[in-house]
Structure formats: C-alpha cells, structure tokens
C-alpha cells in the first residue's frame, strides 16, 4: 500500500504538532490565536514587525468571508504576508525571531481560509462549544464543599 489516504477536510488548528500531522486535505491555523500572540508579544517587545503581522492577520480574518475576496486581492494578501515573514529581523527580540521561524514553517496554513470559503479563519467556535464541559471538569471536585460551590458559582456568572 504505502500511500497515505488524504481525507477531504480542512483542520482548523492551534499549531500543536499532533494537529499539524493530522492526515487531511490541508490545515488552517487559528488566526485569533495568532493575533492574540502578536498582541502579547508587542506588549513585551514593542516590535513594529509584530504590529505589521497582526494587521495582516486581521485583514485575512476580515477577507475570509467568501463574498469579500477576489483572486487579485487574495494574491496581494499572500504576497504581503510572504514579504513580512521574509524580512530580516537582525535587531529584533529573540521571541520575535522565534515566532517568525515558527510561522515560516506553517505559512501555507495561514491563508487557507482565503482559498476555501467554508473554512473559518479561527477555531474559537469549537472552543466555545466545549467551554462549559471543560470548566465543569476543572472545578467539579471542588463542589463537595460550600466554598467550592461558591467558587463555581462565581466562575459561571
């Protein structure tokens, strides 16, 4: 046999290595997570490069709706992203350089949502759908005491 079967779906991922190894048609990296990472990194470093990156990520999210992107505009966004990622960062903070290296490895997965109209730019909808279950799992052992129950009530409100 030898050949792997590609499944006909696009996985929206948080960049975990196991997720990126999933056998699927392609991946879309969650841009909400990348934007959040850019915000945090900019607060720590004040990097202008990170601000450019955040701006283009936001544009990709905005343009990821099927009716709002034309081929020429999409190609322009992809070209600008490549230019940003390929900039030399000789005087940048080490964490900024690390982010750049990580993004270069997955750059094809950043703009998938511009090519496939049904693919969302972020996976927050999945995370929201499991939030209540996960929250209950985290605090369920505390419900045996009055203090635990009160803490749970505060968290849920």
Where are these regions (language model features)?
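Catalytic center-proximal scaffold of phosphoryl-transfer enzymes
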Residues: 1-157
């Amino acid at each position: 046999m030898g050949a792997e079967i590609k499944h006909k779906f696009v996985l929206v991922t948080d960049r975990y290595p196991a997720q990126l190894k999933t056998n699927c048609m392609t991946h879309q990296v969650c841009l909400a997570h990348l934007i959040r990472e850019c915000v945090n990194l900019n607060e720590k470093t004040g990097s202008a490069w990170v601000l450019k990156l955040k701006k283009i990520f936001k544009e990709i999210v905005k343009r990821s709706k099927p009716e709002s992107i034309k081929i020429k505009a999409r190609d322009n966004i992809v070209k600008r992203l490549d230019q940003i990622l390929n900039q030399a960062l000789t005087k940048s903070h080490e964490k900024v350089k690390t982010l750049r290296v990580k993004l270069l490895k997955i750059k094809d997965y950043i703009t998938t949502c511009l090519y496939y109209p049904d693919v969302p730019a972020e996976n927050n909808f999945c995370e929201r759908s499991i939030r209540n279950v996960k929250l209950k799992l985290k605090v369920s052992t505390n419900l045996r005491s009055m203090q635990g129950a009160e803490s749970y009530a505060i968290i849920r409100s």
